């Protein structure tokens, strides 16, 4: 089973490609994997910051992340987190982010 350490390792190894192709500025892990509460059915929750908006290439980016991790990934941007209207959920996400 994937661990937060293995996810961080995979993402760090992919950083040169992610920066060059998508302009990734920073990636963070949150949710069950960040808290060590994952199970076999857990997806990987990430927050991705980009140098500039990537538009529809975000779909390609998400598919690439799922491919390298071998798991479904839910990816938010910092703006997406700010738009969460339930304050407790947004705060929980922000407090659990582990940047890689």
List the predicted regions and their residue ranges.
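Catalytic core of pol beta-like nucleotidyltransferases
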Residues: 1-26, 35-36, 40, 51-100
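Conserved histidines in hydrophobic membrane contexts and catalytic metal-binding motifs
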Residues: 29
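Short beta-strand->loop micro-motif that forms the acidic, two-metal-ion catalytic signature
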Residues: 45-48
């Amino acid at each position: 089973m994937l661990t937060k350490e293995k996810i961080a390792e995979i993402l760090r190894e992919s950083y040169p490609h992610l920066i060059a192709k998508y302009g990734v500025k920073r990636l963070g892990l949150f949710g069950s994997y960040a808290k060590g509460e994952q199970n076999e059915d857990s997806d990987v929750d990430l927050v991705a910051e980009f140098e500039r908006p990537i538009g529809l290439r975000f779909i390609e980016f998400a598919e690439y992340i799922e491919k390298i991790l071998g798991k479904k990934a839910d990816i938010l941007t910092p703006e997406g987190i700010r738009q969460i209207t339930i304050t407790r959920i947004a705060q929980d996400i922000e407090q659990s982010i582990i940047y890689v």
